[in-house]
Amino acid sequence: MEELQGYLEKDRSGQQHFLYPLLFQEYIYALAHDHGLNSSIFYEPVEIFGYDNKSSLALVKRLITRIYQQNFLISSVNDSNQNRFLEHNRFFYSQFYSQIISESVAIYVEIPFSRRLVSFFXEKEIPKYHNLRSIHSIFPFLEDKLSHLNYVSEILIPXPXHIGILGQILQCQIQDVPFLHLLRFFLDEYHNWNSLFITQNKSIYVFSKENKRLFRLLYNSYVFECEFFLLFFRKQSYYLRLTSSEIFLERTHFYRKIEQLRIELEHFVVVCRNYFHRTLWFLKNPFMHYVRYQRKAILASRGTHFLMKKWKYYFVNFWQYYFHFWSRPYRININHLSNYSFYFLGYFSSLLKNSLAVRNQMLENSFLIDTITKKFDTRVPVILLIGSLSKAKFCTVSGHPISKPIWADLSDSDIIDRFGRICRNLSHYHSGSSKKQDLYRIKYILRLSCARTLARKHKSTVRTFLRRLGSGLLEEFFTEEEQVLSLIFSKTTPFTLHGXHRARIWYLDIIRINDLVNHSXLS
């Protein structure tokens, strides 16, 4: 975004608030496809599921030339004939042009939001706000807060029934009318195009592979609208707590001057005082926390089960009356934290209870006190990861490693490097797991799948190939953090293996979820 701001400073003229002219600038398309801008230190890109993100500058120039032709978009808008519409799809709705236009449009829409975000952190004087972008920054927050809470509610945020609802939300944020017309035209025609090939039961609009960036931005704007009203009602309940029950008592005594009703009035005031205290405390819950990633949200509270049900029906009614679509109540589950583990961001999280007996000595008497401590625990979802590995053709459904035939044509170093990067990415992302032994099974599957792929390429057996390579193959699957931790623990404490298995590390520059973890979450 800093590079984009530099380009925008050069193009500032009389049309500072217009985004439509940026459609004819080549550098916008270059920035839209520069995936290195969103890279991370501990994320090494590797193609796992076969996505192709290649771009061509010559095709971009050809696209801009076609857009300059005024009858290009007008003829598509006025055309209602399906046969003629299918003629236009050869150019405008081909896979490449649809992708580059949508991702470039997403760049335009991100401009006002990015400026607002930077100004917000500048006003709040938050120096290292980039660390807040990390996915791992959520887990230290959960470690501090969840141990004091009682109930957790898992919310699966529904997708709007019509894609036009997503576009209407941006009308209040963007003032460029031509750009809004272009966005509305693109969304409507994209909806019509997909309706020719995709059934009504599949909602593919938000997580479309071809238009991932645009629909992710539109969906986040829709979720921001939901969370804005959630924060609004949360603040309103906070202000209700400011109505003091003591003031209610004084006013009651002031207006009631009849001496004969004094005893009954005092009883009435005590009842009202207790009732109002409970009611206002019910509306204002200081121990409520909300965390979201993509469509999955977690709402945790220290209140009662009845309070969580009220928030549940608030969400259902809000989606129904504000966004005009029905939300299924079973999408929101309410569970007690003491005996429940929830899946969030690639981890199974739960609260572990540890009982501790403490002997207390008072003068000549001594007695035991049983204390219970709660600890936030995170574990690797082994079964879900194995299912994701089976989809990527690394193993069977039962977890038996198999070869990767599509990579058999690569060189030996490339094959080992690809498997090693996948293994290191998983190790970095799941570095916060309390039991590293669960991750060793995933590493074993990848390591043996790599050996089977190499053996298939050289038409040999796995045992023969491993004897020839020796320990060189295993070194590629070790991460830097494991080597550093083994070095540190070997110098500081004799319990090297014990400490390395239980040490949890959260990285503050992992800004994207691992592909294998993401696919296991969506499955």
Swiss-Prot record:
Q: What is its main location?
A: plastid
Q: What does this protein do?
A: Usually encoded in the trnK tRNA gene intron. Probably assists in splicing its own and other chloroplast group II introns.
Name the domain of life this protein comes from: Eukaryota
Asked if the keyword tRNA processing belongs to this entry, the reply reads yes
* Subcellular location as annotated: Plastid, Chloroplast
**GO molecular function list:** RNA binding
Q: Kindly provide the name given to this protein in its UniProt entry.
A: Maturase K
Organism (species): Asphodeline lutea
Disulphide linkage map: none
Query: What family does the entry list?
Result: Belongs to the intron maturase 2 family. MatK subfamily.
**PANTHER family for the chain:** MATURASE K
* Biological process terms in GO annotation: mRNA processing; RNA splicing; tRNA processing
Q: What keywords were assigned to this record?
A: Chloroplast, mRNA processing, Plastid, RNA-binding, tRNA processing
For this UniProt entry, what's an example GO CC term? chloroplast
